[in-house]
Amino acid sequence: MTDSTLYLIKAFFLGIIEGLTEFIPVSSTGHLILIGDWINFTSSSGKVFEVVIQFGSILAVMWIFRARLWQLIRGTLTGVPAETAFTRNLLLAFLPAAVVGAIFIKTIKQVFYHPGVVAVTLVLGGLIMLWVERKTHHTPGDAPGAADDTASDERASAHTLEQISWKQALGVGVAQCLAMVPGTSRSGATIIGGMIAGIQRKTATEFSFFLAMPTMLGAATYDLYRNIDLLSQHDLSAIAVGFAAAFISALVVVRAVLRFVANHTYRGFAWYRIALGIVVAAWLMTK
């Protein structure tokens, strides 16, 4: 196998990882950092590669929600109250990360983009998810672990996207800022932040998907603009392969997640995060 073929295989594999992990609460950036290190994926345009495969993921979610997205745009432009309120909530949720990212993202990447940080945030994020799921379902008189995974979130005040208040949307936006630290997970921070704010789990997941559109498009476009000079002709084929792999795998995952959260909690993802964080920590100690 030639070096160029192996390089394309690695790019394809990382694209799959991006698509599989971007919209579940396990941290796509954390996985890309860890797996890229494990498989020794080196690219002169590594930053551009990561940005472009994120474009693949976000285009997948835009394609899946294309009808609802068009309804939202048309309703906002024509002054439909429910759609206008939803757009306002998306903007409110988008702004905190946009401001914090514009000011601190360079420092955050320099300080926190390390496997050790990923290990810690994976475990902490998993523990927080377990706590929130228990808090959401546990009611007085229940035995520990007695909550039914298929139960609705009784304490939630917002069960549809239209019921989300501006305060809840802003709370989700503040939570999204935490996702700038690798290993935290953008989807995890926004979904769990939404649940803490009183949004029902499935609705919080859907809101997270819609919030991903302006957030990821804005961040990816900005990163691409800043790092476009790093792009080389040699890496174009790998970037194209990674983009396609991320798009296709994200199509599968987003549909699967929407079906999953209708009848399940996020506890399984929480335990996965904790286990992976421990494995990564053990691996780092042996290096």
Curated annotation (Swiss-Prot):
Q: What is its main location?
A: membrane
GO terms of biological process kind = cell wall organization; peptidoglycan biosynthetic process; regulation of cell shape; response to antibiotic
Please name the source species. Answer: Bordetella petrii (strain ATCC BAA-461 / DSM 12804 / CCUG 43448)
Q: Summarize the protein's role.
A: Catalyzes the dephosphorylation of undecaprenyl diphosphate (UPP). Confers resistance to bacitracin.
Q: Which residues cross the membrane?
A: 6-26, 45-65, 85-105, 111-131, 204-224, 238-258, 265-285
Q: Which reaction does it catalyse?
A: di-trans,octa-cis-undecaprenyl diphosphate + H2O = di-trans,octa-cis-undecaprenyl phosphate + phosphate + H(+)
Gene Ontology molecular function, alphabetical: undecaprenyl-diphosphatase activity
Which cell locations does it reside in? Cell inner membrane
Q: One GO term of the cellular component aspect?
A: plasma membrane
- Protein name listed in UniProt: Undecaprenyl-diphosphatase
Q: Which PANTHER family match?
A: UNDECAPRENYL-DIPHOSPHATASE
Under which EC number(s) is this enzyme classified? 3.6.1.27
Q: Which domain of life does this protein belong to?
A: Bacteria
Family membership, please give it. Belongs to the UppP family.
Please name the InterPro entries in this protein's record.
Answer: UppP
